[in-house]
């Protein structure tokens, strides 16, 4: 029944004024930004790394580059226009969390675009313009309207929210509950031949 689940990506920035700094990793940035020790920042990110590992993800915060995400969000909206947003997001997350790539760098975004089959000449023109900036800003505005203050943040069927790095079971339970309720409210929609 997972065919009835639609994933919608939305843009959000924790630190919209953050300057990209390829010489600084995310542990260093977090320590400075939160006013905590580097050791404490590493502990916090190690917790997230361990949660990610439980679901088969590899996070390398020691090499994750401090990068403003606005251009990456514009790239994601461009990819959405061509039906490639899921692939774009997966590649962006891998580039940032695993591969230590600068996701604010146009060349990095062009490489990802090429990997997922986007027209890189059109993508380059988009990234060198302000195209999709309004889409990103609209998503951020919507997030503020519903009370988003951190990432990750997930909304299920516009009813249930899961915030922060949570155990996989929290997502499973929320997804199952929201889908069961949706199915009950939409009898005949999920499977028109079954009533």
Predicted features along the sequence, with ranges:
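C-terminal cap of thioredoxin/glutaredoxin-like
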Residues: 1-3, 9, 76-195
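Structural alpha/beta surface segment adjacent to cysteine/selenocysteine redox centers
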Residues: 1-96, 192
